[in-house]
Amino acid sequence: MIALINKILFSNGYERLDIEPSSSNEIFYAFYLPEGHQREEYFVTIQLQEQSDTAAQELLYEKAQILFEEISNSGKVDRPFEKNCTLLICHEEEKISRQTILALEEDHYNFKKNVITYTSNELESLESYIIENGIEKIT
């Protein structure tokens, strides 16, 4: 799912920041709009390699702040990052509780957070649709 979300961001003019995570359980990418755009908006996409409700709670209570600080202190983002960044969390639907999703999305600290849940069948169907219809850019 994270590859699909990243493709959407690339298709809409976002560029990837080169930042390495300090933790090995997450795959994450940071995106920004290059100079010349009228808004300063950042997105961070993340997918836990070992997905579980407990791992998602760790992201909420510990790792999101660490990730936020790593990106903020990287020297690769401007001051507006602190107020204009959305964390898109890709997580398999059956491996996260509704309560944890709400806790993540309602958390007011560091990032604005959105959880994108999916099933394996939904992801496979969407990927097949994109390939079968020759869709190269998703805007």
Report residues per predicted region.
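N-terminal "first-domain core" detector
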Residues: 1-73
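Short secondary-structure capping micro-motifs at structural edges
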Residues: 68-77, 98-104
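"Short basic amphipathic alpha-helical interaction patches in structured regions
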Residues: 59-63, 98-107
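Conserved beta-strand segments of the P-loop GTPase G domain that flank and frequently precede/overlap
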Residues: 44-50, 86-93, 116-119
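Nucleic-acid nuclease catalytic cores
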Residues: 75-98
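Charged, structured surface patches that assemble and position nucleic-acid processing machinery
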Residues: 20, 103-139
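Switch/connector loops and helix/strand junctions flanking conserved nucleotide-binding motifs
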Residues: 54-55, 96-100, 124-127
